[in-house]
Amino acid sequence: MSFPLWLWLALGGAVGAVCRQAAVLLLAPLVARTGFPAAVLLINVLGSFLLGLTLALTGRGVWPEAVRMTFGTGVLGAFTTFSTFSTELDGLLLRGQGGLALAYAALSVGLGLTAAVAGRVLGARL
């Protein structure tokens, strides 16, 4: 008897949420020392790379569609976080750190897009 796809999706979401929290805790000293939201930046960039790779490999049929749902939507959907990025950006602006907010936004979008493209390119070659 196989698990229904929705159950794999839910399990993937649980794994992604736990991994994100572990990464946040691991990087908490860096964030506290610098005041820069490095944890969410790194989480989102890594997630962008892994999603680009996953979509390339499932799109080519190397991995089954269930992997896209379980890993792409479940794990990576829970691991990455646009809402936390947005609220951290807002917090920087509220504290009068406009330059840091601009750097955070530019790095998040620029590195995230670069990582997604790199994942897609790697997936096309595997």
Curated annotation (Swiss-Prot):
Keywords: Cell membrane, Ion channel, Ion transport, Membrane, Metal-binding, Sodium, Transmembrane, Transmembrane helix, Transport. It is a multi-pass membrane protein. Coiled coil: none annotated. Its main location: membrane. It catalyses: fluoride(in) = fluoride(out). The chain crosses the membrane at residues 7-27, 36-56, 74-94, 98-118. It is found in: Cell membrane. GO terms for cellular component: plasma membrane. Pfam families: CRCB. Na(+) binds at G77, T80. One of its GO terms (molecular function) is fluoride transmembrane transporter activity. The keyword Mitochondrion does not apply. GO terms for biological process: cellular detoxification of fluoride; fluoride transmembrane transport. It comes from the Bacteria. Na(+) is not transported, but it plays an essential structural role and its presence is essential for fluoride channel function. Fluoride-specific ion channel. Important for reducing fluoride concentration in the cell, thus reducing its toxicity. Belongs to the fluoride channel Fluc/FEX (TC 1.A.43) family. This is Fluoride-specific ion channel FluC. It comes from Deinococcus radiodurans (strain ATCC 13939 / DSM 20539 / JCM 16871 / CCUG 27074 / LMG 4051 / NBRC 15346 / NCIMB 9279 / VKM B-1422 / R1).
